[in-house]
């Protein structure tokens, strides 16, 4: 999407509900712009004495404006500017579900003068018209795409301005310091000299707060993209049973025959608020079976692509030569050792396994009995601990910055550090202002106070059409 002007004048239309193979009960066509009401009045016929007032719902029919042919029986929602999502006149046709009806309604809107909306254009208008800042706009996209309650909670926090608030405060502090410096440059003879130690302390305080905001980036990335976890090991150690116990389902086939799992079986879970894609893989061993050999290759590929590898062994057998071979293949990955089937051995045997049956270099070890659901909580705790997120719950979250925001905040941090070095090296005040301006601009990029059209283009093109 190319933004040619910063003040939209055309009227846009799009289908606002998801288009899926399964038909929903309702489909919505949304319009926004100065001509939205006029187009709606051309297409929509409300029987009786219904009043076309803002924030009212009308009942009626959509007919072709030239032929009078009935298209659908609908509800019409009216939201006049500025009390709308975009702060423009907005109307929504609530049609019967099914792609044919809503596509026909959309086509009539376009024929009547509306333009097909680009991805994210409704939210872009909300931003350009001052209803949302850029962090709030991005939070809407993140809320729509959230895969867990914790991710949704973080997105809602951003939508409520909890991320923008500290960023604006830091930017205001930088602007205050810049004003002090520029006043000394312009009115050097009329004002006392700057206290360099005081300015440096203020910059240090800003850097501390900025670093705290930046520290949420890794948490935010995990909440948005999740983790990929691969369960690997030799045949018949209970990998599929572990997946089934963990996912509370029968996703994987379980038998006593080696080589039952011949392909990667996936399951989507949420662990401590983090979306987790779990991959149950074929048992790794030397085999002449062509199909099983392909499965073994895919197991190795899954281990390479995973964020965390669960190397699973059998407590009844202990650490075998094949376990050692597999370990050597995956030891460069982040590894958690799963000692499965501990319910089949006595306590003494279990302690022996813990002490001598696996390399001392494996520090993360969890004992499980998948068939009895034993050890699942400990496994989840080990995974969260592995990514330093052992308490990511909605009640413990305020906000988390995304990748774009983190990049801008990093630029702001670097500029502030350069400003401190400039002061330390006794360079002229003009040099101080260069670094400070760089930091102020970078902070403004986060909230949208200083942002280029190309950046807006990238951000809003990631939205769905109709949002």
Curated annotation (Swiss-Prot):
InterPro entries: G_TrmE, GTP-bd, GTP-bd_TrmE_N, GTPase_MnmE, MnmE_dom2, MnmE_helical, P-loop_NTPase, Small_GTP-bd. GTP binds at residues 236-241, 255-261, 280-283. Mg(2+) binds at residues 240, 261. Residues 226-388 form the TrmE-type G domain. The keyword Aminoacyl-tRNA synthetase does not apply. One of its GO terms (cellular component) is cytosol. Keywords: Cytoplasm, GTP-binding, Hydrolase, Magnesium, Metal-binding, Nucleotide-binding, Potassium, tRNA processing. Pfam families: MMR_HSR1 (PF01926), MnmE_helical (PF12631), TrmE_N (PF10396). One of its GO terms (biological process) is tRNA methylation. GO terms for molecular function: GTP binding; GTPase activity; metal ion binding. It comes from the Bacteria. K(+) binds at residues 236, 255, 257, 260. Binds 1 potassium ion per subunit. Its cofactor is K(+). It is found in: Cytoplasm. The keyword GTP-binding applies. Its EC number is 3.6.-.-. PROSITE patterns: G_TRME (PS51709). (6S)-5-formyl-5,6,7,8-tetrahydrofolate binds at residues 30, 92, 131, 467. Exhibits a very high intrinsic GTPase hydrolysis rate. Involved in the addition of a carboxymethylaminomethyl (cmnm) group at the wobble position (U34) of certain tRNAs, forming tRNA-cmnm(5)s(2)U34. HAMAP family: GTPase_MnmE (MF_00379). Homodimer. Heterotetramer of two MnmE and two MnmG subunits. Belongs to the TRAFAC class TrmE-Era-EngA-EngB-Septin-like GTPase superfamily. TrmE GTPase family. This is tRNA modification GTPase MnmE. It comes from Trichodesmium erythraeum (strain IMS101). The gene is mnmE.
